[in-house]
Amino acid sequence: MLKFLLLFFLIPFYSYSGCEDGDCNNGYGTYIWFNGDTDTRGWVEGDKYVGMFLNGKMHGQGILYFKNGNIYNGSFHNGSKSGYGSLIYKNGEKYLGNFLNDKKHGTGILITNNGEENNIRYKFGVKFKDNELF
């Protein structure tokens, strides 16, 4: 019975979201989301961030590895993707451009799997074509 109780109380400590390495408060660290946890930004179980933190939030340069296979490498501000970054999709396509509050914003380049480069403009995550929404 004692073994069961000990196991019952120790399991939560092995499957929590949190700082896995370094200083995830005000420095450089690794933060991993586990145990089905999500946060208000939508990071989910299996996502991992490696980079700079300020006041416990992603801030500065970092890399965000998504569980779905996508990878964002770039600037963060106050916990969200903001500034210049690259988003590499699991299908091999790449977006290089600006982000604001976790959304593509401003000009960028989409590089397809066959190497074709397309200039793209976004406004708060909405794609523009010929200066008009579509």
Language-model-detected regions and their locations in the chain:
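Absolute protein N-terminus
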Residues: M1-K3, S17-G18
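Sec-dependent N-terminal signal peptides
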Residues: K3-F13
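Glycine/tyrosine- and acidic-biased, solvent-exposed loop/turn segments at the edges of beta-strands
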Residues: P12-F134
